[in-house]
Amino acid sequence: MHGLLLAAGLLSLPLHVLAHPQPGTSLAGRAVDLNAYRMADRASYMSSDEMQAQQPHIASVSAGGYVETATEVVKRVMPGMTFRLVDDHYVGVSGISHVYFRQTMHGMDIDNSDFNVNIGKDGKVLSYGNSFYTGPAPDKAPMVKRDFSDPMQALHGVRKALNLPITADKATVKTVNEHEVTFMGTTGALSDPSAKLCYMAKEDGSLALTWRVETDMGDNWLLSYVDAKSTDQVHNVVDYVSHATYQVYRWPIPDPTEGKREILENPWNLRTSPFTWISDGKNNYTTTRGNNAIAQANPDGGNEYLNNYRPNNKNLKFEYPYSPNMSPPKTYIDASITQLFYSANMVHDLYYMLGFTEKAGNFQVNNRGQGGKGNDFVILNAQDGSGTNNANFATPPDGQPGRMRVYIWTKAQPARDSSFEAGTVIHEYTHGLSNRLCGGPANSACLNGLESGGMGEGWGDFFATAIRLKPNDNRNANYVHGEWVNNSPKGNRLFPYSTSLKTNPLVYTSCNKYNEVHAIGTVWASILYEVLWNLIDKHGKNDGPTPVFENGVPKDGKYLSLKLVLDGMAIQPCKPNFVQARNAIIDADKNLTKGANKCELWKAFAKRGLGTGAKYDPKNRTGSTAVPKECQ
């Protein structure tokens, strides 16, 4: 290989590990601030209305099938650029075709340069997102110049810069292909680290040749972009972690203070889980394992899970004692695992109905020939011993299992187990949803910027809040996130979610004073909470556990809001900002209902400063309460 040792076992694209409610983004136990390494949000988004007004020649493109049409759009918008089709395009349940492209240079990826095209169910171009690099190209291919470091130096550079407890003194480098290697014989990571030679578009408009080093450290699953010439310089870091009969708290009881446990028989939905929750179509289980998830205890916080303890009952009676007063937590581990398994499967089934299917990159072992990549249920670790007072979800690309770690919270006595707080489980699972939808199932690195990462947190809060609405709630209802596990009426967010600007004063420009994803996420979820109630006021509220559809459209406002937000995730560009995500939701409604809710959406966004005149600038966002003329 021309003197370069490169390896076997393809390096997967970014996995997102997102932590639940605790502010601050740092490497677990190592005092390194990952915010300093976040990628800039570089994408542009051309909405349906903008394209009709500014680029009618693009809106009218038609070149046969949806992939061919999308390819032609990229060629016309970015003439002369080289790119490749990412093999994860699909037609969603709303009829929108999603096609994804990655920019290339000298035969190598520019790893943060993406283009996504959305084709409406009418076959016309709906919108597109673009973050292609437009600066000067290197004069020679790096594989010709050989002007880059050994990959082992890159691993050492990452280890030093991020203070990773990886030992590589006896490691060897195994070649995967001309651009990729795997490091064999290291210790300290949960799996063998790997590296891929690729370009990175920098914030200053230049292009850097980098080694993308992947290290799974458990609570952090990192893609570190190390300068290929000076391996002591780390340009950016992506973290994938963000951060029968069942006796359970019935969905969607939020926590043990608001309901009693019940014994539910066969709680699955055969339309969304046709093998039930305890079979994968080939094997039937008598434990908390099935096609969608596998749940177990993980007291030592390790990476192994298949042989970990989980309750087993040949009669399929998962009925175990639990009371919030029980202590220590291990005395009720069976109940904890069962509750976590139940809640995660309920989320799977609901999100499937809303459009998070096999083609869209959902989490299942057996995809039944429905598209996407299988063998990727969610690994659910109850009472995970790797931390306390938190939870996180790791989202690798489609075809690799997601991993949810749920911790014990020590802010009350006795300590509280977050498996029993539905909002925690919904929030974490929603990281998997947003990371698989945004940018396509094969790209899990689209929500690692400050504003895009903040929206990832906000979507988690929004879905958790909307799903937990009570039958008697109206737009005056306020919701606190993380109240029970935190043992605090204020929870762990800046303000309660509320339609009152006195109770919750957050507006779009509030983001100007925040530099942390949970704070920015609270702003985004506060805006979406306005969307929720505007649509409920117009269409009513379905208090059942599943939506009722008419011609593919939820009939009530609660589930319609979830559907539009979910569709918007798939439409928006990789690394979106608030303005682009707003436009994607409006485009989702245009596709789904022909824009029947345009004014309700605009009024909700405008109320909190995301009106027609809102502008994104990472340091000085401009707010607006204006709405389109037809909505005044």
UniProtKB/Swiss-Prot annotation:
A Pfam family recorded for this sequence: Peptidase_M36
Free-text comment on the cofactor: Binds 1 zinc ion per subunit.
GO molecular function, one term: metalloendopeptidase activity
Positions that bind Zn(2+): 427, 431
Residues carrying a glycan: 284, 591, 620
Broad EC category: hydrolase
Chain positions listed as propeptide in the UniProt record: 21-244
Subcellular location field: Secreted
Signal peptide residues on this chain, from the entry's feature table: 1-20
Keywords, alphabetical: Glycoprotein, Hydrolase, Metal-binding, Metalloprotease, Protease, Secreted, Signal, Virulence, Zinc, Zymogen
GO CC, alphabetical: extracellular region
EC number of the protein: 3.4.24.-
Domain of life, source organism: Eukaryota
Residue numbers annotated as active site: 428
Biological process (GO), any one: proteolysis
Entry cofactors: Zn(2+)
CDD domains: M36
Function: Secreted metalloproteinase probably acting as a virulence factor.
Family to which this protein belongs: Belongs to the peptidase M36 family.
UniProt protein name: Extracellular metalloproteinase 5
